[in-house]
Amino acid sequence: CVMYKAVLHDHLDGGLRAATAKELAIKDNYSPLLNVDDIESFFNRESSESLEDYLEAFVHTTALMNSYENLERIAFEAAEDMHNEGITHYESRYAPLYSVNNSLTPKDVIDAINSGFKQAEDLYGIQSGLILCGMRNDTNNVKQVTEIAVNYKEKIIGFDIAGPELNYLPSLFSDEFKKLVENNVNLTIHAGEGDGVNSIQEALDNGAKRIGHGVRIIEDIDLETGLFGPTATHIFENNIPLEICISSNIHTNMYSDYKDHPIKDLIDLNFPVTIN
């Protein structure tokens, strides 16, 4: 019996191979990583105190995603790594403006990543797609990536906002989400990770077809009585998938231990969860 697996929530800049990061740092003379002996431990950051602290490592990975060649390789290796884990369908997200420079346009960034994915598909059969991310702590960034997503919607599979969730609720970007929905760009919105149920509700109100993380929907459920609050009811009745990322939640200290994670409660309640 073959088990077909999918990954719906993965950040391209969060999964560089340690050896590749070291090699690219040397090639590009990226000094912050040149003297790091154990890059894998440096990136794992399992002792992070918060989501914001955890995200600091992304500064270094995105710095290496500065050329067509690097992006293409990183995308290929990401899809290859997924294939080696038994994944047949892979959706990866990335904030393209991190890579735009004098020699790379937004289209170049998208094309480079898709080229890497296509190479992996040709070699292994894995199907991969790109979700563009705007950074929610930078309003102008979200506006620009919205335009990019609309202009190149045939080359991508969706749009998201990433970055620190607290204090940057989805409602701040209602105009952008409206434009994306009007142009038939699929929305999955980070919510219910760094902030609570209100953030999830705002994501739904703005057209999200999936919720990135969404684990804090558990706060809208009375586990003793089995009663759902309005947001949990909407997700349950409309079969809105939650992109649960258990190890990420542990690394960012949302939960101190795997046994404390509410994934089993959500599964037992028949919520539409995916594990990433």
Q: Over which residues does each language-model region extend?
A:
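Metal-cofactor-binding active-site regions of metalloenzymes
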Residues: 1-185, 194-205, 210, 216-276
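Conserved hydrophobic beta-strand within the GNAT/NAT acetyltransferase core sheet
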Residues: 187-189
